[in-house]
Amino acid sequence: MTHTETTVKLFFAAVCASAIAVTARAQPAPYHHYRTLNTQHFRITVPDGLEREGRVAGAAAEHAYEQLARELATPRGVIDLVVTDDADYSNGYATTVPSNRIVVFATPPVDAGSLRLNEDWLGIVITHELTHIFHLDRTRGVWSLAQHVFGRAPALFPNSYGPSWLTEGIAVYYESRLTDGGRLKDSESRMIARAAALEHRLPALNALSLGSPVFPGGISAYGYGSLFVDYLARTRGDSSIRRFIDAQSATVVPWAIDRDARNGFGIGFGAAYDAFRDSIQRSVGTLTPPLPGWRELTTHGYFAVDPRFTSDSTLVYASADGRSTAAEYALSLDGTRHRIGRRNALGPSVPYLGGLLFAQPDRVSPSEVRSDLYVERDGVQRRLTHGLRLVQPDARRDGTIVAVQLAPTRSSLLVLDPTRREYRLLRSAAADETWSEPRWSPDGSAIAVSHRTHGGMFSLEVIDVASGVATVLDRGAFIITSPSWSPDGK
């Protein structure tokens, strides 16, 4: 056997092995009846009942394709786009294996703060995932020849060898540049970076990963990655991103991306990131308390969210510390805390008839994740609803509950009486309309709620429960969220 034959056989074995080791992803439920819609560049597949959402997604995808085609080399062939409603969270993913395909969950982002700044959230998700296709499908040189022989094996896409901060950073950059929203237009990533700079803890480039155990976890790949890519585009020119992607797609050693960076941006990633990090460090001053008399009650770091007072001296909050599962904690004002119970996701827990009321997602089948209401008393959790798709509950003193009900591309308001097992629709929603974060007034006569309508207009409204009449307190093309009442009902 010649050396060349041995090399070819070893390479073929590596390709076959990589095809087996593809990362598993959530798949749409196989038992739905599906319909297919066709556009110029997409084959759109939707389950029965989501035909409207499929048409909207098709139009958004063609618009995103047209815009991205002005920036990057176009991908090969027709792209499969699946719109599904199998999970009660807003998400999507893209893959180039075995063909170019995108899956988008139709649930609107009522919980994801960084995705709420938009005129069309479905357009943002599709633009983000389609950028992955434009980026990762790009294959030239020896890689193109290898795919011609072996097919679309995972190991034969050179751009897929890049780190997650690069892949997600490029996608967030284009989602923000080519739409009216996007995470670069939101303040969250910049706040995280500036907070780290204030403590002189800006992460190293090799620490930016979807699997990072350090705050902010996998968000670092999106946040820092997009800020860095945006910095490169501003300092090296918009066209430098295409030059880099083209260089990366033909490189023989795909993980040696610093050479491709010099070809595309005129500077290696290491040197560029040092300059980027220095620019953030120079933009911040000194760390000062946000308010006079400010005192930090938690020091464990990572995520501590959704605090709710249960008495004058105690509050509860949801936490994920990076070392254990998400959980609810009770915290006294002297800093003493204890763990109440685990949670499947972070979210508010509110006082409810001697216990705590909360919503959490769980699998109802191998392919479906649904959110329902639970109550916890004395360490025992009991499920209150089944299949109602409820999030963000709040409870009145008599036990009446208001919660957000999720549906494809919209969310509504429900009022529930669990003792009678009755519920009524307080506010319905049209497509691309959401009601979120309802809060009872102290006297239980009204509900404050955030309302988003089509086109990205937000309003803060107070609904009189008896009459159903709403008073609009504020309205505008900016995010209005997290309403709360003062003890005197204001």
Region locations from a protein language model:
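Beta/coil-rich, acidic/histidine-enriched accessory regions frequently appended to metallopeptidases
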Residues: 27-38, 216-219, 244-353, 359-362, ...
